[in-house]
């Protein structure tokens, strides 16, 4: 496998930072920049598996699934797992296959999709109650993940 230059490693991280629109996304992007720099320096990118860390991250995963609408920060999630943000981010990614920000976003969108189908609550109320800071961000993210707008999703109710 050809080794990427540090600048090539940072391109997807920079794109993610530009797309982030909340604290968790910004924090995560900053740590990914640091991780990419450390990886470029050491030449190693493999996270070491640790059963205790995995259990702690699993507890955080369950918490996010139970309350995805809660405002979260990477620092808070890492603290809850008794890990540094850097190690938490790496361990979370190894366990779940996605970053904490991506996982939270997916859970929020899943809950919103269920509510859109089961209730007549206004779309804006659902967006805010599920943890999105503004309606345009919700609409954009929903459309990207679900392939249609929230309104179109609701109209397709069975």
What are these regions, as identified by a protein language model?
Residues 71, 120-121:
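Residue at a beta-strand N-cap/secondary-structure junction
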